[in-house]
Design a protein with these regions (language model features):
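Hydrophobic face of amphipathic alpha-helices that form TPR/SEL1-like repeat modules
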Residues: 1-38
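Short, well-ordered beta-strand elements within core beta-sheets of diverse protein domains
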Residues: 43-49, 66-70, 156, 266-269, ...
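ALDH superfamily catalytic-core signature
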Residues: 240-381, 444
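Glycine-rich loop-to-alpha-helix module at the N-terminal edge of alpha/beta enzyme cores
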Residues: 41-131
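A short acidic/small-residue loop/turn micro-motif
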Residues: 25-27, 31-32, 47-52, 272
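Residue-level signal for inorganic ion chemistry
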Residues: 40, 77, 99, 121, ...
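Rossmann-like NAD(P) dinucleotide-binding subdomain of oxidoreductase/dehydrogenase enzymes
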Residues: 133-276, 328, 401
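Conserved C-terminal structural/oligomerization subdomain of aldehyde/semialdehyde dehydrogenase
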Residues: 41-44, 230, 267, 371-488
């Protein structure tokens, strides 16, 4: 049923690559299969791009910079992005169904991602002609000013968990600054990424401004990173691969934006509004089956309200339902058998812990689907591996703390620094703790701020470096030139 539903919503080829505004067969003539994680069935084939394909894509982008794409004004680029946003919005329902089946994400979450994609292109379309340089007071007879210019050709390596969201925030910002892009989506889930090629043509983007080359990371991704004509790399994925990306990029001395892992805490003080906090505490941990870099996998709670919190969270946890993605329940499957195995192996480390609550499976789930029950563990020591390492699954641990100082110490005890949340009504405490937390984002009495296309996003430590989203991302996708004119 899902295969027919998928095909009914596809309006572009999935088994080709997109270079210079055209769909074509990859030079390797090889294909990779895409599975539906809800039932393990093969739902599509994609191209297995090789070095020749990557070279053609980069050359196409380079040529576009020298003619049709590079000749556009900032406002003209902005109008193209606005048109792309409109086309995405017109296809929200199609894209949501495709993403839900491809990634295994509940339909309502996939629809939110499609709407976010449209908003990213809208935001960066509006920002395209708002980038300004500065004039700098200097010596007599000098006029000094700065210019913001594109890097040139940017490479974008996109993960499987949020293809649309991450395309929106990296491709959108890069195009707004005038870069030409080569996109290498994940081989595990890339069907909505391929839609961007078709939509770009419909919007009127010049040939070569956007190129899409799916394939294996160790082959297509590696070739893209090593290509001598790539001027900037944006990578979202694991810490392990992020280190390799940065190492290879360093050989060509090109800048890299890394958005990697997380072990993000929510800190619940004794004066917190628990009724308001509860949906955030749970949803931030189980959204997309916990396969989110900014997932809140650690819940730090004051010992004064520990018993009350676990009672309330446990009751809600037991109501969570795992089902096929298209059935639109609380959780769908994880992406693959490999990811399920990783999560299962971590759960084997929990034998010394108390599982205080878990969700339930929907009846008659397909046997070949990659399903994992959400689990909540109580009274966990902050040094435990389940409290230190990124699991990338629906597993949350509750860690009690003594006081504010103890909470800060525990929150900062991992290698990561992506997101944190503070729940307290004490304004002075809000400011103190927000300043003390080692994290790229801190939310106060909320978590995620509703997605926040406008809000800069990025990490510290093992969570990576550089910033995506918001106006700040435009600076990362540009270089600064200083011009000093002497008037004699």
């Amino acid at each position: 049923m899902e295969v027919k539903l998928l095909n009914d919503n596809l309006w572009y080829p999935t088994n080709k690559i997109f270079i210079n505004g055209q769909w074509k067969d990859c030079n390797s003539k090889k294909r990779l299969t895409i599975e539906n994680p809800s039932n393990g069935e093969v739902i599509a084939e994609i191209s297995d791009s090789c070095e020749i394909d990557i070279d053609e894509a980069v050359n196409s982008a380079s040529k576009a910079l020298g003619n049709s794409w590079g000749d556009l004004t900032a406002s003209e680029r902005g109008r193209l992005l606005m048109k792309l946003s409109e086309l995405v919005r017109n296809r929200v329902d199609n894209l949501a169904i495709i993403e839900s089946i491809d990634v295994g994400k509940p339909l309502k979450q996939a629809k939110n991602d499609a709407l976010a994609l449209a908003r990213y292109f809208e935001f960066y379309g509006g920002a395209s002609d708002k980038i300004m340089g500065e004039t700098i007071p200097y010596l007599k007879d000098y006029t000094v000013y700065t210019l913001r210019e594109p890097h040139g050709v940017t490479g974008h390596i996109i993960p499987w968990n949020y293809p649309m969201q991450i395309i929106g925030r990296t491709l959108g910002a890069s195009l707004a600054m005038g870069n030409a892009c080569v996109l290498k989506p994940s081989e595990e889930a890339c069907l909505t990424a391929l839609a961007i090629g078709q939509l770009a043509n419909e919007a009127g983007f010049p040939e070569g401004s956007i190129n899409i080359v799916p394939g294996l990371g160790e082959k297509a991704g590696s070739c893209l990173i090593k290509h001598p004509d790539i001027n900037h790399i944006s990578f979202t994925g694991s810490v392990e691969i992020g280190k390799k990306v940065q190492t290879e990029a360093a050989k060509n001395l090109i800048p890299v934006t890394l958005e990697l892992g997380g072990k993000s805490p929510q800190i619940i003080f004794e004066d917190a509004n628990l009724e308001k906090a509860l949906p955030f505490l749970i949803n931030a941990g189980i959204q997309n089956a916990g396969q989110t870099c900014s997932a809140s996998s650690r819940i730090l709670v004051s010992k004064k309200i520990y018993a009350e919190l676990i009672d309330k969270m446990s009751k809600l946890y037991r109501k969570l339902t795992v089902a096929q993605a298209i059935d639109d329940k609380d959780l769908g499957p994880v992406i693959s058998s490999r990811q399920r195995e990783i999560i299962t192996n971590y759960l084997k480390l929990s034998k010394d812990l108390e599982c205080i609550a878990e969700g339930k499976y929907e009846k008659n789930l397909p046997e070949k689907g990659y399903y994992v029950l959400p689990k909540l563990f109580g009274d966990v020591k902050y040094s435990h591996r389940l409290a230190q390492e990124e699991i990338f699954g629906p597993v949350q641990v509750i860690i009690p703390f003594e006081d504010e100082e103890d909470a800060i110490k525990i929150a900062n005890s991992t290698k990561y620094g992506l997101v944190a949340s503070i729940w307290t009504l004490d304004g002075a405490r809000q400011m103190r703790v927000a300043k003390a937390i080692k994290s790229g984002q801190v939310f106060i009495n909320n978590y995620g701020a509703g997605g926040g296309v406008e809000l800069p996003f990025g990490g510290k430590g093992y969570s990576g470096h550089g910033r995506e989203k918001g106006f700040e991302a435009l600076y990362g996708f540009s270089t600064l030139k200083t011009v000093a004119a002497l008037h004699e």
